[in-house]
């Protein structure tokens, strides 16, 4: 079964409907971008900001954002600044966000994709507690915080990465109830690697989606719409 993100994003906007109306166009998000920024992601942020009635302004650096008097910032450069000190940084881009993710707490500092994954599992009633979750990838924005949020929900979590032996990886995936693919290695695993009833969250395109005989949150139309909705909910908060 394909589990799409749009219904989850719609439900989140409905949950915040009163906030959206009360704060209409009063919240400002400063987006720090340059030539390395993903244009598709920028467009998605723009569309979602309009739905949430959040104003967007743009800067090319944290220094410029500071001179503009920015308070809430999102750095979409590659790589982003290691620490947006002095700002209310979205997507876990400062120490506060990393600490909250480490203790498994979802709040306005939590990395958005990690929170989106948990929200999707909850929306589709995918059990987490007591399940074996394999997270492939250890990035600061997705892999690590997702692992900690799953752990906080009483999953047994294994983190794999680019240095994990391929044989060990396949063995772990075969025994998993939940697999989060977030390493960006296209085609790393496919349906032959997972067991019946497993839920695969294909964040980074690692999973070959040629077969749909399982619960699949797809690369396109999956976590992405929920991630931008979570981002805007953080701005309102």
Question: Where are each of the predicted segments found?
Answer:
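Short hydrophobic segments within beta-strands
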Residues: 30-32, 90, 136, 160
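Anion-binding alpha/beta catalytic cores of soluble intermediary-metabolism enzymes, centered on
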Residues: 2-5, 63-128, 169-170, 187
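N-terminal ligand-binding/catalytic initiation module
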Residues: 1-78
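Conserved Rossmann-like nucleotide-cofactor binding loop
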Residues: 79, 141, 206
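Generic structural signal for residues in well-ordered beta-strands
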Residues: 54-58, 157, 216
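Rossmann-fold NAD(P)-binding glycine/threonine-rich loop
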Residues: 83-101, 196-237
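Glycine-rich phosphate/diphosphate-binding loop of Rossmann-like nucleotide-binding domains
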Residues: 37-46, 69, 107-189, 193, ...
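Adenosine-phosphate binding glycine-rich loop
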Residues: 2, 9-18, 22-23, 28, ...
């Amino acid at each position: 079964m394909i589990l799409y993100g749009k219904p989850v994003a719609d439900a989140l906007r409905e949950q915040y409907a009163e906030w959206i109306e009360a704060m209409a166009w009063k919240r400002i998000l400063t987006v720090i971008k340059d030539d390395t920024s993903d244009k598709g992601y920028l467009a998605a942020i723009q569309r979602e900001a309009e739905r949430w009635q959040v104003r967007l302004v743009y800067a090319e650096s944290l220094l410029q954002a500071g001179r503009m008097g920015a308070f809430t910032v999102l750095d979409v450069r590659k790589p982003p600044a290691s620490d947006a000190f002095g700002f209310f940084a979205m997507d876990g881009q400062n120490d506060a966000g990393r600490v909250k993710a480490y203790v498994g707490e979802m709040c306005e500092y939590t990395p958005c994709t990690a929170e989106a994954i948990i929200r999707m599992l909850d929306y589709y009633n995918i059990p987490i507690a007591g399940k074996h979750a394999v997270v492939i990838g250890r990035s600061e924005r997705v892999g690590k915080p997702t692992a900690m949020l799953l752990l906080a929900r009483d999953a047994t979590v294994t983190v794999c990465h680019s240095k994990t032996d391929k044989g060990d990886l396949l063995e772990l995936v075969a025994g998993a109830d939940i697999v989060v693919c977030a390493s960006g290695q296209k085609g790393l695993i496919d349906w032959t690697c997972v067991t019946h009833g497993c839920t695969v969250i294909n964040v980074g395109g690692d999973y070959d989606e040629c077969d749909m005989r399982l619960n699949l949150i797809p690369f396109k139309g999956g976590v992405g719409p929920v991630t931008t909705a979570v981002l805007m909910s953080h701005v309102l908060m």
